């Protein structure tokens, strides 16, 4: 049996593993499809994550250095790549009552030929409805962050909405914003293929930020008013600067991205100072979230799963390219790390 592992920073390989016996609360799944996470996972893959040498302390709500003798947060050679898997249950533990051998399921897990997942009181292990799309299923994770970004920005009927960065999260945010009643939805991304997909799924306009004054173009498209809401998923300083420039007075920026360090030159004066901008940092898995207790992570997940399985969201075009598991190391290094412009969310077939 093989699994996809980061053996060194920016190096992926298939590594042999021995299957272990499942515990009473677990199921073993033979994986048929999967997908990695193109955002935070690739930061880890590049050894650029703060979690390597630091840990986020829940009591202090801040990062703190790991003790010198403590394991690092990411250990290359052990770091398994992948985020979501779809497959069939081939073994059930004795305490498992909600699943059976043969069930087709989707869950969080790494890209490996088999995965073992807790199946007792685990709502995150989802049964696949008959005839449902695996491509929609592996978008379960990005859909949650897209939906929280839209909700935290309080998108309302008639709003002018901009989505910056048209990866999987941004593409799903486009669909959600349009279906929430936004009158104008604008996508921002330099990659023409991503813009084409966004237009097919709800974007009224798409802007290429390279060599353009995106903020002014947003104002032009909205009759000089600017955007009521800008959902920022790219994590780049220039994107946030443009968002502050294109935002309507009193508008909201929903900051979904796990940002890169900002270089010198980012300016919170200028339009940010004059336009009463509000920036909300949106993260679906940080609880309690802004609408707690009515909305919890569980409710977000259950809503996203329903929207993915009933076809309200369409992620077929987002899973591109699709590679075989045998070619997944090369695919991961090319499409996820080295040339992310060639993909939106890479799919893997087994």
Which positions does each model-derived feature cover?
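Glycine-rich beta-strand-centered segment in the early N-terminal region that forms part
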Residues: 20-35, 47-108
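C-terminal capping/lid region of NAD(P)-dependent oxidoreductase domains
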Residues: 224, 254, 260-261, 265, ...
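Mid-domain Rossmann-like dinucleotide-binding core that forms the NAD(H)/NADP(H) cofactor-binding site
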Residues: 133-212, 216
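Residue-level marker of beta-strand positions
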Residues: 103-104, 114, 160, 179, ...
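Glycine-rich cofactor phosphate-binding loops and adjacent beta1-alpha1 units
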Residues: 155, 200-280
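Active-site capping/gating segments
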Residues: 278-302
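A structural motif shared across PLP-dependent enzymes of the aminotransferase-like
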Residues: 80, 108-121
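Short, glycine/polar-rich helix-capping loops at beta-to-alpha or helix-loop-helix junctions
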Residues: 113, 190-197, 263-268
């Amino acid at each position: 049996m093989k699994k996809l592992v980061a053996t060194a920073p920016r190096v992926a390989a298939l590594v042999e593993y021995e299957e272990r016996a499942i515990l009473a609360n677990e199921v073993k799944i033979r994986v048929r499809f999967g997908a990695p996470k193109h955002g935070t996972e690739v930061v880890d893959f590049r050894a650029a994550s703060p979690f390597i040498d630091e840990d986020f302390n829940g009591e202090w709500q801040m990062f703190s250095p790991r003790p010198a003798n403590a394991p690092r947060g990411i250990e290359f050679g052990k770091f398994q790549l992948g985020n979501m898997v779809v497959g069939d249950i081939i073994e059930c533990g004795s305490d498992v009552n909600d699943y059976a051998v043969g069930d087709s399921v989707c869950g969080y897990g790494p890209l490996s030929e088999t995965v073992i997942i807790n199946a007792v009181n685990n709502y995150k292990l989802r049964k696949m409805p008959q005839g449902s799309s695996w491509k929609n299923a592996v978008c379960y994770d990005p859909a949650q962050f897209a939906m929280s970004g839209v909700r935290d920005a309080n998108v309302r009927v008639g709003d002018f909405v901009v989505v910056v960065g048209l990866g999987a999260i941004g593409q799903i945010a486009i669909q959600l914003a349009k279906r929430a009643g936004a009158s104008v939805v604008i996508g921002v991304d330099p990659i023409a293929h991503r813009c084409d997909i966004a237009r097919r799924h709800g974007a009224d306009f798409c802007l290429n930020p390279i060599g353009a004054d995106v903020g002014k173009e947003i104002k032009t498209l909205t009759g000089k008013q600017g955007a009521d809401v800008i959902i920022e998923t790219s994590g780049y300083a220039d994107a946030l600067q443009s968002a502050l420039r294109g935002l309507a007075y009193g508008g909201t920026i929903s900051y979904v991205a796990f940002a890169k360090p900002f270089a010198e030159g980012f300016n919170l004066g200028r339009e940010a100072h004059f336009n009463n901008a509000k920036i909300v940092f949106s993260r679906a898995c940080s609880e309690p979230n802004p609408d707690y207790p009515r909305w919890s992570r569980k409710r977000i997940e259950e809503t996203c799963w329903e929207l993915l399985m009933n076809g309200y969201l369409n992620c077929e075009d987002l899973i591109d390219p699709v590679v075989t598991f045998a070619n997944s190391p090369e695919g991961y290094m090319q499409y996820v790390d080295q040339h992310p412009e060639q993909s939106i969310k890479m799919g893997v077939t087994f």
